[in-house]
Amino acid sequence: MKPLAIPANHGVMGQQEKHSLPADFTKLHLTDSLHPQVTHVSSSHSGCSITSDSGSSSLSDIYQATESEAGDMDLSGLPETAVDSEDDDDEEDIERASDPLMSRDIVRDCLEKDPIDRTDDDIEQLLEFMHQLPAFANMTMSVRRELCAVMVFAVVERAGTIVLNDGEELDSWSVILNGSVEVTYPDGKAEILCMGNSFGVSPTMDKEYMKGVMRTKVDDCQFVCIAQQDYCRILNQVEKNMQKVEEEGEIVMVKEHRELDRTGTRKGHIVIKGTSERLTMHLVEEHSVVDPTFIEDFLLTYRTFLSSPMEVGKKLLEWFNDPSLRDKVTRVVLLWVNNHFNDFEGDPAMTRFLEEFENNLEREKMGGHLRLLNIACAAKAKRRLMTLTKPSREAPLPFILLGGSEKGFGIFVDSVDSGSKATEAGLKRGDQILEVNGQNFENIQLSKAMEILRNNTHLSITVKTNLFVFKELLTRLSEEKRNGAPHLPKIGDIKKASRYSIPDLAVDVEQVIGLEKVNKKSKANTVGGRNKLKKILDKTRISILPQKPYNDIGIGQSQDDSIVGLRQTKHIPTALPVSGTLSSSNPDLLQSHHRILDFSTTPDLPDQVLRVFKADQQSRYIMISKDTTAKEVVIQAIREFAVTATPDQYSLCEVSVTPEGVIKQRRLPDQLSKLADRIQLSGRYYLKNNMETETLCSDEDAQELLRESQISLLQLSTVEVATQLSMRNFELFRNIEPTEYIDDLFKLKSKTSCANLKKFEEVINQETFWVASEILRETNQLKRMKIIKHFIKIALHCRECKNFNSMFAIISGLNLAPVARLRTTWEKLPNKYEKLFQDLQDLFDPSRNMAKYRNVLNSQNLQPPIIPLFPVIKKDLTFLHEGNDSKVDGLVNFEKLRMIAKEIRHVGRMASVNMDPALMFRTRKKKWRSLGSLSQGSTNATVLDVAQTGGHKKRVRRSSFLNAKKLYEDAQMARKVKQYLSNLELEMDEESLQTLSLQCEPATNTLPKNPGDKKPVKSETSPVAPRAGSQQKAQAQPPPPQPQPQHKINQGLQVPAVSLYPSRKKVPVKDLPPFGINSPQALKKILSLSEEGSLERHKKQAEDTISNASSQLSSPPTSPQSSPRKGYTLAPSGTVDNFSDSGHSEISSRSSIVSNSSFDSVPVSLHEERRQRHSVSIVETNLGVGRMERRTMMEPDQYSLGSYAPMAESRGLYATATVISSPSTEELSQDQGDRASLDAADSGRGSWTSCSSGSHDNIQTIQHQRSWETLPFGHTHFDYSGDPAGLWASSSHMDQIMFSDHSTKYNRQNQSRESLEQAQSRASWASSTGYWGEDSEGDTGTIKRRGGKDVSIEAESSSVTSVTTEETKPVPMPAHVAVTSSTAKGLIVRKEGRYREPPPTPPGYIGIPITDFPEGHSHPARKPPDYNVALQRSRMVARPTDTAAPSPIQQPHGHPASGRPVNKPQWHKPNECDPRLAPYQSQGFSTEEDEDEQVSAV
């Protein structure tokens, strides 16, 4: 019997833990908002300031919220500074851009429902969430679905609670959803189970008993439990549902019977596993309603188990000869070409297969299918660029051309000489020539095209396979030969084509595309024809295309019904002759019409503006379209300038100025198009008289041009920068082939080497370092602040563009240690932008597997195009791959491949738009500008409106086009942004960035005030400079005592209890299965435990509701490091930031930076005080226990993190603790300090930067990291010897560090460089150098400078008794305790409600003591780790950290450390004075009556 069914600690588990372990802190964002939150506030709220009842991300809600609630959001109690009032062009957009994309935490809602009440949709939501957990690995989907239907949700509020006792009877199988538990075995060994692990019974009804004692290690542990009876029934039922297919006595395929809903209408058998041959054969077998995506899944994933695609191709050609299989074979080939045309391009064998298959279709007279095949080929073919050289102009061309605008076609290759260079370059019959040497060939006469090709010896040719139109051309030519007269098609004829069959519709579309440009006269008809076609397509979209290709396909559905067309199939009219060959899961076959229409040709509307000059420097604005040629521009310019000459006498010239000041002038060919895109910033178009040799551009004009071409970031519109970033990112994202994900995931060799994927992967690092480079190269502090503000705005607009990738990269760049340490720069940032920045970070809160980001991404209101966060995609795919076996019992595990294919399809849909992304992103920007009011309509719906309704698009655009000059200026701005982005010089070396950072703001040294307390002055490499450095003066540092024994490491290994969902109902005990029936209390264990804190949670429900309202309303921290808000910190703010996040930051726990879990560092007595008092200020002095004075006011956001600092125990570097002042008397007993820290969204400022493909674990640190976290990463070059104060004390900004009991045998003086290196080596993807340290303005606990002035404490204003260094007496303190501060006062009082708060410590994070690392181990490199390395580092380390009661801790005053109760976390132990405070009796507590003041005890 297996008492504990604990899955092996698979590598993937570490991954998953990395993402999901931290509890969800959305509930904890405390605010000053007076607007009550809706009661169903979910954990997925982005924490921003505005929440709409519907949870909708549409901006219509946001607009209203902005006008009502947010109207005072940015202004209440916050005096404007000069920077705040800057009137930028897009300043007004910020309000709207800052509004959050909210969504409910659907998973939590589903879990809290009674299993009987769960709907099919609820089960699908749970299925989607659970399938990523290691406990469910290798289970079939039906088993998972059944388990999701019966699972019960349970929460254990407090750390240290016994869940199961040794010998207790087990009666359920449970999976940890959040937090971690420790099992202590009778022999003393301990094992830690983390998120995704399971424990409990095995699938049998035999009695099983617990071995060992299981305790929760962190607060807010969440579990789902399945009763033993249900678990046994479901797992044993699997065999009954299995259908095994045997051949010659061997099992070749296994199918499973599934029911996808409770109606019984959708049930059947689905392939689970099989041999490669049998899976291939299944392509042409009947597929049940529950397995509609088998063909798509197979075609995407066959490459993982077949060596060559021709193994499938040969079978298909063979089966085509069987009339009964012919239609099915054709459907497979159509889907293959449509979905993965790259399998055919560039592969001669597959190209021959395609040609043979076309011949077979022609032979069998399957014209409709053939047409569809050609459409798919044309739609999916990629543009190819090839370069040909000729020995001389007279040399013959190695190919023959057909077509030309005179026939209504483009230029096509009819034949290519075999063995020629053109053949080697890849030119082949049926290719359409799109461009030669920059000249557009899509609308050109054949004779002119031949002339251009002959007159150039160097040919740069852009071609694209377009067999369909090529065959139309051949048909037309043969008709002309028969009839003797050329036929010029009329585009208007399309209106006669009211047929809705797919092939005919496709023909019409292609006619528009291929024939629209018959001649110049027909251009107007072309536009009209396109509009008519669009109307037809719009009318038929109901029957052919999904109305919302992204939305209706069921985001929340399981893989079984993913986008398989269960809803759409019934809409396809029976009249379609080829309905059997189409899968509605791949509407691309039909969307390709749109794509060809919108991407291959551009609207002929004059949507661009040229500024054309004459020699006398007069200029006119000329409206053109993308395809307008230089000759046409000359004609318009002559008309505009009222010149009375013929167009032949003039030409268009481009004059440009090189950076050296050389003026270049060239005449443009008459047929040159895309003129607006070609002009450089340092160039102008001139109308030149061919008969004159006048100087077009004088030297003065040239100098002006040169000046205009020199641009800096601050000159650029933030909206335009975000637009261009989004366009660039989307183009890269859209070009990723689905097969590249598979090749990359399974490490397969491919022709392209996943080139597109790698490019998209690199972008996030490039953009991250761009941010840092731009900020650190600016030497002027005010400009630096403005650049930071500029980037925050850009990130906000990226969110509007749904460009989460760039948004994340920018936040990462601002969090890079060299940027984060710029304390004085960040202090100048206006308060409004602090809030906006915190909101941005909040969206990427890593808790519960990025729940907020995922909920936003899956929001029903979020329509493509979306640019998702790539590291999350990579992480999800990696988890699916590594969490499931590729082969089971010698058979291919197709269930795994199906899940991976579903995920890739889901990602691909984000790029499935029916319009040019450039047009789409620009439409949003123009709409803002042209409509004036920013609060009309929903921006999220803008894309959809524009994409689906041509009229709306035209209307919006025309409103912008009325002013040619304005349009030109917008286009000029876009050109500036493009040039700026293309010429970026990135500094990718973090060492260099750190050097630049130190040049911007040199590190300051800590000089002791008292002569007797002199300590070695630390060099400027002190890793963390608390942010308050400028306001605090160094205080005396007592001589450190002898190093203390390391045995006190377990002193308080508990994270404060955090009630993540304070306003949520608890599941009644009676409704849940018990963990053990023989427990001492004879209670149903976990469920009853989860009830213990419910009373207190309910008491504070109202306040929590308010506090959840938004982080925008809650005065987020100014700088990258967050600081205590209205609560008072026991430890110096610097240290608080630096370590208090220990549990909540990814690095400290997952990456296992040397923290020993989040210790319960706040003494019991403090907790009790916190319960009774609203705000506590504890000023640490060298004299003794801090005295807490009660503050009389009640403010919901007065939480500061208590008890997160204690990593000092293991680090021996720092011990800190903050006391959280809470709005309710009972609140902290459950919520503990975690809630307090939530607003520390900046805490992510730390190390979540260079996010390459492997950075799925990186995302964790986004919100919860501080400068201190990076401390251990990159500073191996620091010399710690001889510094009693150690790393942290060395900075002049060092704040006081509070608890001596956490000291380890490493005193500060002994903190060796190795210890940092060891920590560094554990770091995950965070900014891999630790520049958080160096002077890092790690002290977010400090006050912001207002208007350039330090907000120091005035005794008169704050009634706080500050303890100055003169008053302090040296008291023996642990070596790691440094009492330093950069202000003369012991307290810093901040007014106006700008509160910083120490970062949160995620429950469930288990840090690793520095002593666990071997000496001398160091990080191999400073670059972000390789993906696999990061994966390995993300694992949780099982240690018996909590098992034994802590040994007494040597206190300076001899007080023993309080031990931890077995069943009750120390945090909650009331009315007991904690001796740990004894050494720090404070002389300086005072009450504050002014509710606008904030005091940080430092």
Curated annotation (Swiss-Prot):
SMART domains: cNMP, PDZ, RA, RasGEF, RasGEFN. GO terms for molecular function: beta-1 adrenergic receptor binding; cAMP binding; GTPase activator activity; guanyl-nucleotide exchange factor activity; PDZ domain binding; WW domain binding. It is found in: Cell junction; Cytoplasm; Cytoplasm, Perinuclear region; Cell membrane. Residues 83-94, 1487-1498 have a biased composition (Acidic residues). The keyword Cell wall biogenesis/degradation does not apply. Residues 267-380 form the N-terminal Ras-GEF domain. This is Rap guanine nucleotide exchange factor 2. The lineage of its organism: Eukaryota, Metazoa, Chordata, Craniata, Vertebrata. The gene is RAPGEF2.
